[in-house]
């Protein structure tokens, strides 16, 4: 049986559960796929060229995580779906010798919310994940605000119709979303007292990090604010990515069940 290689680019990457859940699916669905897939973590130096690495490693597909999602958008031969709007790519697939970029973070995040009725969201951070979430939340009709420590990247969110801030707005939000990398450094993304104010009036504190109780989520727990980590989003976006890797042979709900069973 033919062997195909896949992977996930990131820095850091040691924490990623993507290899675990994708390899479970390549094993489960190898008969339907007609090939044996292997998916591995790829620690990418910050100055690396993603496309060169992808081709050099002979990959058929890859996921992209922090801090490369915006750079991945720039190196694709084609961009499809909501990735065109959000300027960030988390899924790369080699299709007819062209490197095609997709974004499954956007829908993956929305599906992980479970259909709850939220009206407003505050996104902390302005990177590739924040862009994907803002696009999807705007599409779903929410009022979206973005808070970032600097003006870097905020022009994108302004064009999208989001309210943008460099200082914490004095408003209440249903969703408070940590899309920064602060949790990977075991830090809060924002002043503790300011966060407390948001959590006390919010409906859900959501951290894109997963696998441990982050300082962000720990604070929400302390205040008895409902909270959620990024595990659900990871599995949904990975299921949607796997569907792309399989050329739509395996629909994402089937993939989701396998991934959920191993993580």
UniProtKB/Swiss-Prot annotation:
Q: Where does NADP(+) bind?
A: 125-129, 208, 230
GO molecular-function annotation terms? Answer: NADP binding; shikimate 3-dehydrogenase (NADP+) activity
Q: Does the keyword Chloroplast apply?
A: no
Quote the EC number: 1.1.1.25
Pathway terms, separated by semicolons: Metabolic intermediate biosynthesis; chorismate biosynthesis; chorismate from D-erythrose 4-phosphate and phosphoenolpyruvate: step 4/7
Q: Where does shikimate bind?
A: 16-18, 65, 90, 105, 210
Please, one GO biological process term? Answer: aromatic amino acid family biosynthetic process
Question: Does the record's keyword annotation contain Zinc-finger?
Answer: no
The reaction(s) annotated as catalysed by this protein in its Swiss-Prot or TrEMBL entry are:
shikimate + NADP(+) = 3-dehydroshikimate + NADPH + H(+)
Q: Which key words tag this protein in UniProt?
A: Amino-acid biosynthesis, Aromatic amino acid biosynthesis, NADP, Oxidoreductase
> Which Pfam families does the record match to this protein?
Shikimate_dh_N
Recorded GO cellular component terms are: cytosol
- Can you tell me which residues form the catalytic site? 69 (proton acceptor)
Outline the subunit composition.
Homodimer.
**HAMAP family from the entry?**
Shikimate_DH_AroE
- Describe its function: Involved in the biosynthesis of the chorismate, which leads to the biosynthesis of aromatic amino acids. Catalyzes the reversible NADPH linked reduction of 3-dehydroshikimate (DHSA) to yield shikimate (SA).
Which family is annotated?
Belongs to the shikimate dehydrogenase family.
Tell me the protein's name.
Shikimate dehydrogenase (NADP(+))
> Gene name on record?
aroE
């Amino acid at each position: 049986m033919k062997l195909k290689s896949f992977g996930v680019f990131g820095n850091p990457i040691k924490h990623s559960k993507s290899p675990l859940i994708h390899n479970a699916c390549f094993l489960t669905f190898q008969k339907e796929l007609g090939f044996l897939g292997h998916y591995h973590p790829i620690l990418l130096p910050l100055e690396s060229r993603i496309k060169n690495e992808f081709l050099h490693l002979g990959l058929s597909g890859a996921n992209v995580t922090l801090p490369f999602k915006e750079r991945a958008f720039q190196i694709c031969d084609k961009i499809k779906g909501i990735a065109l709007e959000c300027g960030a790519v988390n899924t790369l697939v080699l299709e007819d010798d062209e490197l095609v970029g997709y974004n499954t973070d956007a829908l993956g995040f929305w599906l992980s919310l479970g259909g709850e009725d939220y009206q407003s969201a505050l996104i902390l951070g302005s990177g590739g994940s924040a862009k994907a979430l803002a696009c999807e939340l705007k599409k779903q009709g929410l009022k979206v605000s973005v808070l970032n420590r600097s003006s870097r990247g905020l022009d994108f969110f302004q064009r999208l119709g989001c309210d943008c801030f460099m200082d914490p707005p004095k408003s209440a939000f249903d969703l408070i979303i940590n899309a920064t990398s602060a949790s990977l450094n075991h830090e809060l993304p924002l002043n503790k007292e300011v966060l407390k104010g948001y959590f006390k009036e919010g409906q859900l504190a959501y951290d894109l990090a997963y696998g441990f109780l982050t300082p962000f989520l720990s604070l929400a727990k302390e205040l008895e604010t409902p909270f959620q980590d990024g595990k659900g989003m990871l599995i949904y976006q990975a299921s949607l990515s796997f569907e792309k890797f399989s050329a739509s042979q395996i629909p994402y709900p089937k993939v989701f069940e396998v991934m959920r069973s191993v993580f």
